[in-house]
Amino acid sequence: MNNPLLSISNPVKFFKPPIPYRISLNTTINKKQKHQSKTLVVKSNKRSTTSLTSSVSLVRRRNNNGDGETTLVKKVGRDEKGQTVLLCALGYWVQGLRCFSWLALNFHMAHCLNLKPSTLQLVQYTASLPMVAKPLYGVLSDVLYIGGARRVPYISVGVLLQGLAWGSLAIFPGAREVLPSLMAFILLSNLGASITEVSQDALVAEYGLRYQINGLQSYALMASAVGGILGNLLGGYCLLKTPPRILFLAFTALLSLQLIVSLSSKEESVNLPRIGEVTPEISSVLGIVKKQFLDLKGIVQVDEISQPLIWIVSSIALVPLLSGSVFCYQTQVLNLDPSVIGMSKVIGQLMLLCLTVVYDRYWKKLPMRALIHIVQLLYAFSLLFDYILVKQINLAFGISNTAFVLCFSSVAEILAQFKILPFSVLLANMCPGGCEGSITSFLASTLCLSSVVSGFTGVGMANMIGITSKNYSNLPAGILIQSLAALVPLWFIHYVPMLEPGFEREGKRAMSKKSRRNRRVGRVIGQESFAYRRERET
């Protein structure tokens, strides 16, 4: 991209990762209830397994008088979990499959509408403008309920808008043959995709915080990568046999399946908290939205959040992309088949999937700044693969254009996508309760805005140096400028934190057994949180 606060009438407070950055939301909490809440005590006589399918979590809280305790038994059945997993996994999988329809759309604009490279790229990045408004969708998803829920209904609305857009492009010839109408339906499609992505990201972030599951964003990216692999593979092959409108229709059918799943899913199965009550000052919808924006503004201004955001946004916006020119060069000058372009994307998505798995298992324990430094260097040098292709240096080494495009064409794009993952995990772990949708959508919005700026800058640079559909002689110079611009963010790499907060806390908790006797010890297994306080031994 993409959380409600606990009910203030409920004296039970769930564990959530501590926010070490003094991020506070001006929520109205009953002081008496807050004063009575003291220590979370959970006892378990049996050794729990690490399975994520445990169905009961017992939480007890003892009051100050010590004469009573409040017990909450939280049941999450296997069927309910399966429904949640299906909803999220299918959503991210379809999100990755959007490349299936977009590959067909790019070939339709380049070959059927005969758009110039700069015009093609301008259409591509103008279509992303609805995604810039993701913070608005995130705030509405955080505070505005639809039918008693505030995540799943927004997913359904977004999927419906996408289905209407792609279905119209498939059925009505005038919708796809005239550029203004084509642009309108593309914008509608991306509006629906934005709403769906924000709701899914918020649902995943909130679910991970509530059940103490760290790094769920990695699995979301894996599902998206699997969808990208299948979408590019089928898209490249189908374009050789069928016109683009058939691919639009097939993707519409897939969206219909996702809509059925989302409509049949109940948000109560996720067992997420609700916003209990609001103060009279914010009782109106506009008041709630205004308060949420103020909370978001206060959170984003914290250095520990603003500095990583500034770096990742700058690292994208400072690079003038020439993706439209390179695409037209590959298809119009090198005459590469759609299957070759699609297969190159498949290989790239396989690389992204492997990188995500390795990151989730090993690399997320590495210093974040060092990891991002290496990835940015690799990204800057991988942009030179297009330079090698345009200058035909690969032929001097006996590598055909087809083989070179298959192996190296998508490396830079995949590294740019992978670079975002550590920042997504970082901000998801730092989200205060009730702002998951706002924070994740703000991240997605800034990333999208930086991509739009990068694309528009690339169009301007292409026009300045004279890159046209009939003259690609200056394309190598533009690619060199791209690569040099990608090195600029390394000058302020210190904005990236050394470690993610979760691993900093784990390092601080690594202490001797003697020290742990007098400290609170916590461990998380699966979805059950155990915490107890030992008295000082005398």
Curated annotation (Swiss-Prot):
- Cystine connections: none
Q: Which Gene3D superfamilies match?
A: MFS general substrate transporter like domains (1.20.1250.20)
A GO CC annotation recorded here is: chloroplast membrane
**What InterPro entries does the annotation carry?**
BT1, FBT, MFS_trans_sf
Q: Look up keyword Transport and say if it applies.
A: yes
Plastid as UniProt keyword: yes
Provide the topology term for how it sits in the membrane.
Multi-pass membrane protein
Transmembrane annotation, as ranges: 85-105, 129-149, 152-172, 178-198, 220-240, 246-266, 309-329, 339-359, 370-390, 395-415, 447-467, 479-499
What keywords tag this UniProt record? Chloroplast, Membrane, Plastid, Transit peptide, Transmembrane, Transmembrane helix, Transport
> What is the annotated localization of this protein?
Plastid, Chloroplast membrane
> What stretch of residues directs this protein to its organelle as a transit peptide?
1-57
Q: What is the stated purpose of this protein?
A: Could mediate folate transport.
In the record, the note on similarity to other proteins reads: Belongs to the major facilitator superfamily. Folate-biopterin transporter (TC 2.A.71) family.
What NCBIfam families is this protein classified in?
Answer: fbt
Protein name as it appears in the record: Probable folate-biopterin transporter 9, chloroplastic
Which species does the entry assign this protein to?
A: Arabidopsis thaliana
